[in-house]
């Protein structure tokens, strides 16, 4: 049994194994608090994420279980990787991952990015997405703050708490508004990996321009801003709208023509604009895929088809439709954590699961 120590961070109790020291707050989200720490075993800096009250409701339990399963499954240079996980005696869950110094949001708010950095960051995002999508996973919440960067400009996609199966009947209100694909706003179902490509397009545009491309004040304003630049959605896209209220809203908007992106991004590389045009497309069926985007001429300095791997196997989503009580999710979580530590336990390492 691992030894646990307690520390107060922002009024929150961090109860972690003695393996981790020198805690310092990094950030807080809706579902958890993240601290940097020193791993005494490896002497490396790590990020420790505390999941707040993971067993308070079945919904939160399932969300945490999903994120844990994804972190265990996804192994790629451009995706954040899990290095440890444990449940404290207070039954909070802690994910330990590699620590990267900053994120794309902080970089974009501090200074304009030069062309070579934009290219390299975009390449790595798409390289990671190609792998994630090939595993049958849609991230659903890509935004600059979910893209971590270190001092060597290595980039990793993080925060898979909202990730879902590739499913033609997805539903729900997901993704930060500025980066949300129009098919989510228009239909709330029938969307797939292309929603992530739209988000990448918005992030790409923000790297080029230095500010968000579609900074909507609310759902309605967001869609209106999109149509000002990209024009009215084509009829075959409008026909896919399932909600009568949404359909009436879209039909009430003035007809608009798509504006050339060269007018919006006057100083950008023409090849960058050509690629952006293929990402910011209303019809997800014609939106470029991650693998094809990697082969675009704009990314030629970095593209290497022999080093852009896909997942070896699809992620197992069999649990995703389960409607289970908290106690069952808890047992499943314990099982996953014990499975993760199985190799370490065989080697005599401590396992952070309370008795």
Swiss-Prot record:
Binding residue positions for ATP: 26-34, 49
SUPFAM superfamilies, A to Z: Protein kinase-like (PK-like)
Motif (TXY): 171-173
Coiled coil: none
A Pfam family recorded for this sequence: Pkinase
EC number of this enzyme: 2.7.11.24
BP GO annotations: stress-activated MAPK cascade
PANTHER family: MITOGEN-ACTIVATED PROTEIN KINASE
Name assigned to this protein: Mitogen-activated protein kinase HOG1
